[in-house]
Structures are given as structure tokens and as C-alpha cells.
Design a protein with these regions (language model features):
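Flavin-dependent oxidoreductases
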Residues: 20, 193-195, 204-304
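Active-site lid/adjacent beta-loop-alpha segment flanking the redox-cofactor pocket in flavoenzymes
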Residues: 257-368
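Conserved Rossmann-like nucleotide-cofactor binding loop
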Residues: 17, 42, 222
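N-terminal Rossmann-like FAD-binding beta1-loop-alpha1 element of flavoenzymes
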Residues: 7-35
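Glycine-rich FAD pyrophosphate-binding loop
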Residues: 27-50
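Dinucleotide-binding Rossmann-like beta1-alpha1 core, especially the glycine-rich loop
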Residues: 54-138, 291-293, 297-303
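C-terminal catalytic lobe of FAD-dependent flavoproteins
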Residues: 317-432
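Flavin (FAD/FMN) cofactor-binding and adjacent substrate-gating region
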Residues: 96, 105-173, 177-179, 183-185, ...
Length: 456
């Protein structure tokens, strides 16, 4: 079989992570030959699709599970997405402005919210505390049939919502608009990566072979499988977590409404989001449950699943530790029940009523075709879940395992990977141009984004 020409960099995976990297390499480096592989017929068919996520820009201002230090890093990395949307005139195309809030219910949560506002208001000076009088006119549904006192910490007129599929398509088009040799390989699945004696990489797809000097694998749950096939990352395993949503039958809220996080739970608390794919009707969720699939709504590849689970005594110990905690155990069982037809929304409505107390079961419909898979990485040596971005980087090849909300940090992760690839290939990264267009910094201003590992 004839091996095609050598590319400087190959990107495996056409989600928002892969597309943002393509954009960053094409626009801000002197790397000339880049190829991107996407096994489906369009980009962002899986977790970056607006049906598979909450369409949220996670800034750290209303996410109550973020510490102040984590919020500082998240704010800087997420600002790149917001800057791109504004600087490249993508408002109301890929990104949308609206209001958002963190809702506290009951005296204990209100006390916690006030303390959080005091701690975070310097980092996010636009945040406001909203009492019941304000909320009664601003979002009246929050108070209908409400017995407990409430308060919110919110922001008005921010970029809150992003269609990450359209954003991915925008990144692709901006890349193709450069003078670089960009090749997009749709409907082409990479099946194997090997390093050859000359140090270059051979990429075997289901149609042919290619060669590349460097590779970045942004393939969701499959990134770890590619790494382990090459002998890397054997200390990791994957716990595939699925998430589902419920729609209301009409638009009930104008704002994104997040709720206070239970510190014992590793997954996001319920939130309500106006959905850009459904005329801004309210979408509640997500649920979170273990699902024996690597890709939601796609065929099950049993061999890949078994390899990803990588079950041994260390992985089993992590599972046992999770089930030992009664709070997590109840949460897992409840979320599993919420997936059962007809019964599910009877259970889920009680969670949703924390946001809208007057909500009835008849107001909800299961969001068929919505939801995705989030590959949570297990560190077998430490016997714990890695709740954030995991990265393996060796000899010019990078494997990214980025669960939700990695889309928010995609441009920051792309910058980090671009710097690494440029160093490996002895190429140049135009930091000044990137600061001006994406980081929105003045000339020669420093950037603190050097290592965003475990930020998302």
C-alpha cells in the first residue's frame, strides 16, 4: 500500500477540541501541513454536539463546586472562547448572551451563597446578589409555590450559551481560510497509530495509511485506548458516565439557573438551561449514570468497551469506594431510575422542583436523542477518579482525555498543545497575534495560562 505524503501534524478527532487545535495551529504557527481525521460525516457529532451538552460556557462564577483558585484558572481559559466569539463576530451565530445565576434554596444555602459572593466578587465584579423581591419580577417561576426562602448570585448580559458544533465549524472554516495545506478526512476512522524507526508516526485508517511528524489525539473515550495500544497510560482506566436531559413543553426561564453543589457528589448539580436547539425551551439536567457504551446513540463496540474499562483489582477498588459512600450510592441508584421510561420523570421532577417548585410531571418530556457520554478517568495507582482533564504526552504525540466541561477550555488546551507541538517540531508560535486575538492581551503582556491540567 502506498503511504501518502508526510504531514507536520495529524489531529485525530473532529470535536471542538480537535477543531480548536486545528484553528490554533493553522492561524498562529508556521506549521504548514495539517490533517484532521473525523470518523463521522461532520464535525462535532458526539460530545460537542449541542444535543450532547448543556451548551454552557463554564466561567467559574456560578459553578459552586469550584474553589476560588480553580475559578481563577477556569476564568482565564474560558475567556478565550468568549474572546473568539466577540472578536470574530460570532455573537448570535455560535455564542449567545443571556443572564445566569446560582440559586440558593433554604437558609443554609443562602448563608453559603453570601459567603461565596464575598469571596468571589473581586474576581467577578459583574456578579450581583438577587433577593426574592428582585427574582419575583426577573424570574417569577422560581418563586411560584415556593415555601423555602431563596436568593441568587447572578450576572446579566454575559455570553452564557455556545453551540459547540457551530463553533467547531467556525474553527474549521477559519483554518481553511489560511494559506496552509489543510486536509479534512471525514468518514475516515483511524484504527491504529505506530511509531516508526525514523521517529515519524504511521496512521492507519479504514481506507489507507498516512504519516505524520506529530499527532494530537482528541478522540474522547478512545484517546486512552489509542494511548494504551501504544503502551502509554496503562495506569488509567475509563468509567463511562452517561447523561440525559428533560425538556419543559414551553419556555419557562430566560436565564441559566444553576443550583448549589453537594460537596460529596463528583457530578454537577441539576441546572436549567434555555436550549438553543429548541427555541430556548427550558432543558433540565443532566442526570449522571454509568452506561456500558463509549458513544451515546451509536453502536456498541464490545471489545473497545472492555479495553476501556480495563477492569482489575485496582479499578474494582475504586468502584467499591464509590459505593461505600451512602450519598453517592443513593445518587447512582436515583439517576439510574430516572432513565426508566415513564417512571424516570416521576423521580426527576423532584430535583427539577428545586428550581421551579410549581413544575409538574406532565410539564416534562424526556429529551430523546439528547445527552452524551463523559469518559471519567480512573487513576488505578491512586484508586481515585480524575475529575478533570487528563493528558499523556510522549515523543511528539499527545492524548487528551477531556470530560465535561472541556469544551469551555478547548482553546486554552489547544494553545498548550500547540506550544508543545511547536517545541517538538522546532516551529514558531505567534504569541503576540494569539494574545491580541484570543487572549485579548496588550502587546508583551504576560499570560498565566501555562498549565491548565485538572482545571476543567
Amino acid at each position: 500500500m502506498i503511504i501518502n505524503k508526510i504531514f507536520d501534524t495529524a489531529i485525530i478527532g473532529g470535536g471542538v477540541a480537535g477543531c480548536s487545535l486545528l484553528f490554533t495551529l493553522a492561524r498562529y504557527t508556521d506549521i504548514n501541513n495539517i490533517i484532521l481525521f473525523e470518523k463521522y460525516d461532520e464535525v462535532s457529532q458526539l460530545n460537542s454536539n449541542p444535543k450532547a451538552n448543556s451548551q454552557t460556557v463554564h466561567v467559574g462564577d456560578i459553578e459552586s463546586n469550584y474553589t476560588l483558585e480553580k475559578a481563577k484558572k477556569v476564568k482565564e481559559s474560558s475567556s478565550m472562547i468568549k474572546n473568539y466569539i466577540e472578536n470574530f463576530q460570532e455573537i448570535n451565530i455560535t455564542g449567545f448572551k443571556s443572564d445566569k445565576m446560582l440559586l440558593a434554596v433554604g437558609e443554609d444555602e443562602i448563608k453559603e451563597l453570601k459567603a461565596r459572593y464575598t469571596e468571589f466578587k473581586e474576581l467577578y465584579p459583574y456578579l450581583e446578589l438577587w433577593d426574592e423581591k428582585f427574582l419575583a419580577t426577573f424570574e417569577p417561576k422560581l418563586l411560584e409555590n415556593r415555601k423555602e426562602p431563596i436568593m441568587a448570585m447572578g450576572a446579566r448580559g454575559q455570553i452564557t450559551t455556545v453551540d459547540y458544533k457551530k463553533l467547531s465549524e467556525s474553527f474549521i472554516q477559519k483554518s481553511l481560510d489560511t494559506d496552509k495545506n489543510i486536509q479534512m478526512r471525514y468518514n475516515e476512522e483511524v484504527t491504529k497509530i505506530t511509531r516508526e524507526e525514523d521517529g515519524y508516526y504511521k496512521i492507519t485508517s479504514d481506507t489507507t495509511n498516512f504519516r505524520a511528524k506529530s499527532i494530537v489525539v482528541n478522540a474522547g473515550a478512545y484517546s486512552l485506548l489509542f494511548a494504551q495500544d501504544m503502551g502509554y497510560g496503562e495506569e488509567y482506566a475509563t468509567l463511562p458516565i452517561g447523561g440525559s436531559f428533560f425538556f419543559t413543553k414551553e419556555k419557562l426561564l430566560n436565564s441559566k439557573v444553576y443550583t448549589m453543589q453537594n460537596p460529596k457528589l463528583p457530578f454537577a448539580a441539576i441546572h436549567a438551561d434555555p436550549d438553543c436547539t429548541q427555541n430556548w425551551n427550558t432543558r433540565f439536567g443532566p442526570t449522571a449514570f454509568a452506561l456500558p457504551k463509549l458513544e451515546r446513540y451509536h453502536s456498541l463496540h464490545l471489545k473497545d468497551l472492555i479495553n476501556a474499562l480495563n477492569i482489575d483489582k485496582d479499578v474494582t477498588q475504586v468502584y467499591m469506594n464509590l459505593f461505600k459512600d451512602s450519598t453517592i450510592r443513593r445518587y447512582i441508584f436515583k439517576n439510574a431510575i430516572e432513565e426508566i421510561p415513564f417512571i424516570g420523570k416521576e423521580v426527576f421532577v423532584h430535583d427539577a422542583q428545586k428550581v421551579i417548585p410549581s413544575l409538574k410531571v406532565s410539564d416534562l418530556t424526556f429529551a430523546e436523542g439528547y445527552g452524551g457520554m463523559r469518559p471519567q478517568i480512573i487513576d488505578k495507582k491512586k484508586h481515585e477518579l480524575l475529575l478533570g482533564e487528563a493528558k499523556i504526552s510522549k515523543n511528539g504525540i499527545i492524548f487528551n482525555m477531556t470530560p465535561s466541561p472541556g469544551a469551555t477550555s478547548s482553546l486554552a488546551i489547544a494553545m498548550q498543545d500547540t506550544k508543545a507541538i511547536c517545541q517538538y517540531l522546532s516551529k514558531s508560535f505567534d504569541l503576540e497575534k494569539h494574545q491580541r486575538e484570543i487572549q485579548m492581551l496588550e502587546k508583551n503582556a504576560p499570560s498565566s495560562i501555562e498549565d491548565i491540567k485538572n482545571v476543567v
